[in-house]
C-alpha cells in the first residue's frame, strides 16, 4: 500500500453520527472480486440527494473527510474503506471509529484520525464556513493543522492520537502481507529445513 507521511489539501464535512458501513457502501455494490471500482457505491443512497455534500462543486478533489462520531460502525466489510479510497479520500477524521473499520483502514492505507469531539466540530465549522480552508494531516509530526490558505496563519492545531506501531506501519506503507514479506528469506530457510513429509507454505 502507499506510505502516508503528510497530506495537505481540502476537506469536506459530513456531520452525521453513527454512519455504518452499509451507509458508506450498500450491499448491492459489493459484487466485485477486486479491491477497486467501488467509488460509485460510496454513500450511494445519500448521493441521490442533489444537496448532499459530495455533490457540491467545492467537494471535488477533497482528500480529507471530516465525519461525525462513531464513523464506520456495523459490519466488517472492507469495501467501505476501499470505496473511500477509490473516491479519493486519504484521511477520515472523527471523534470515534468502529474498531473493525479502523483496523481495515490501517490495512488499506486510509488514515483514521481520532480527535476530540470539540476539535472535530471546530474543524468542520471552519471547512463549512470556507470550503477553501487548507487542512494538513502530518502523520510524521503527529499533528493536524488548518489554515485559510496554504502557508497562512494556523486556525487550528491538534495532536494526532495514534500508537507508535500503527503510525510506523502507515509511514512505511506496510500491510500484513508486506510485513510478512519482509521476512521472506527467513521463511524460505525455515521451509527448506523442514522434513519433506511435512507440508510447506508454498
Show where each model-derived region lies:
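Cytosolic catalytic domains that perform sulfur/thiol-centered chemistry
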Residues: 1-202
